[in-house]
Amino acid sequence: MDLNQISETLSAVAEEEPLTMFLLDKLYAIREKIKQVPFSIVRLCHVYCMLIKYNASNNNCILGRKLIEEMQQFLCGARVDGSEDVSMDMSELCKLYDYCPLLCSALCRAPCVFVNKLFKIVERETRGQSENPLWHALRRYTVTATKLYDIYTTRNFLEHKGQQFFGEAVIYGAKHERVIRHLVAIFYVKREVKETLGLLLDPSSGVFGASLDACFGISFNEDGFLMVKEKALIFEIKFRYKYLRDKEDHFVSELLKNPTEKSFSDFILSHPVPAIEFRERGKIPSSREYLMTYDFQYRPQRKLRTCPTPAILTPHIKQLLCLNETQTSTVIVFDCKSHLSEQKLSVFQKAVFTVNVFVNPKHRYFFQSLLQQYVMTQFYINDHSNPEYIESTEVPSVHIVTALFRRRTEEERSLHLVIDETEYIEEEIPLALIVTPVAPNPEFTCRVITDICNLWENNICKQTSLQVWAQSAVNQYLAACVRKPKTP
């Protein structure tokens, strides 16, 4: 069975018993107790049941084996050594499908370490992201980073299923994500390229989820489970297709010939809608572009566009701007050297400089970054031996990487692109990266998380009459992220 068939079958299973139907069918009998059960527990049970139903009819392709084994053993009270091969008897597992109320109640009494382990199994089982059918299935009932902005600003939960674009820009972005990740690792972070993570479901609420494009400052234990270290770095990658041009383009050639901020700003302004929005200090930006600046050398000739700020964001936008306007971006300009005898193009760093460019907090990508940082911080807190002693400088930080490429020349078409001995065959040529740190306001992040949890609970109640508890961990997040006063 190929990936498309697996995805279609798993999607059919998910549609056959959506989350609301699962709540009514399996948990309505314990409706008085369900409001005392954190939704994170309910979510694990729903994932378990979905996997059981899929695997029962597809013995030739078992999904989520480790998660099923752990929950099966827990429910049965069995203790099996991790190295032992546990038999997957689907007929027996299907019987456990009817024990969801018991499983929910039992997991509520389970040690936090065990529950956190289950969420780490979910992450491990969904690695590969878009190439993993389970990743797609679990995102269905999750407030992901791409949905956060719309849900928060419109107060409408059910209508937002996330943006889905399938144009050439998205295809190019997906095609170049691996090479961009490699460039960040070699030329910015200067660390080894790490495996991409799967879906990070928020272990406190079970409502939120994040999928990271790149992450550093992590490790994996002997079971392959994620371990988040202090000062982990998160990178959200954005491929700017609208700047993909030929090498002979005037602004491309000028940037390569004399890589300075002047040639860089000229390149940015050469597009009718510049990727960096200029505003005078004190003015509120539009929400069109996710990067902005107060620097006049990025001021376009045409009239600046304005748009209203969503009402719920209006009281906070100036404070969020003040936090982020102090950040600077790093620009790395690349060129390549051809080795015709070896049929290779080796990429090298031609220049690096900083620019007064920062993230626009009115843009949806800012909110995307907030959720990624929040969820990753939950994993860091759970991994920490003394969470109460976490300093604000130790929690994960997030950067947005803007990738600019140029097209290959005719002579370069047959050459392999080489970055640190790794070869890329079809990708275009890197021109520049803009690496921009995001400065979140922990109090604002907590407000967003709390508001959406309440909104989510109300929507579930309207659909099922069940009072489901979407527990958040905003207090422990705030304690970790806010600078602690120095003791005398």
Swiss-Prot record:
Name the top EC class. Answer: hydrolase
| Family annotation (InterPro entries) | Herpes_alk_exo, PDDEXK-like_dom_sf, Restrct_endonuc-II-like, Viral_alk_exo
Q: Which SUPFAM superfamilies match?
A: Restriction endonuclease-like
Q: What is its main location?
A: host cell
Name its cellular compartments.
Answer: Host nucleus; Host cytoplasm
GO CC, one annotated term: host cell cytoplasm
EC number in record: 3.1.-.-
Keywords linked to the UniProt accession: Endonuclease, Exonuclease, Host cytoplasm, Host nucleus, Host-virus interaction, Hydrolase, Nuclease
Pfam families for the chain: Viral_alk_exo
Q: Does the keyword Hydrolase apply?
A: yes
- Keyword Hydrolase included in the entry's annotation: yes
Which residues bear the site annotation Required for function?
E177, D213, E236, K238
Task: Report the GO molecular function annotations.
Answer: DNA binding; endonuclease activity; exonuclease activity
Main function: Plays a role in processing non linear or branched viral DNA intermediates in order to promote the production of mature packaged unit-length linear progeny viral DNA molecules. Exhibits endonuclease and exonuclease activities and accepts both double-stranded and single-stranded DNA as substrate. Exonuclease digestion of DNA is in the 5'-> 3' direction and the products are 5'-monophosphate nucleosides. Additionally, forms a recombinase with the major DNA-binding protein, which displays strand exchange activity.
Family, as annotated = Belongs to the herpesviridae alkaline nuclease family.
Tell me how this protein assembles. Answer: Interacts with major DNA-binding protein; this interaction increases the nuclease processivity of the alkaline exonuclease.
Supply the name of the protein.
Alkaline nuclease
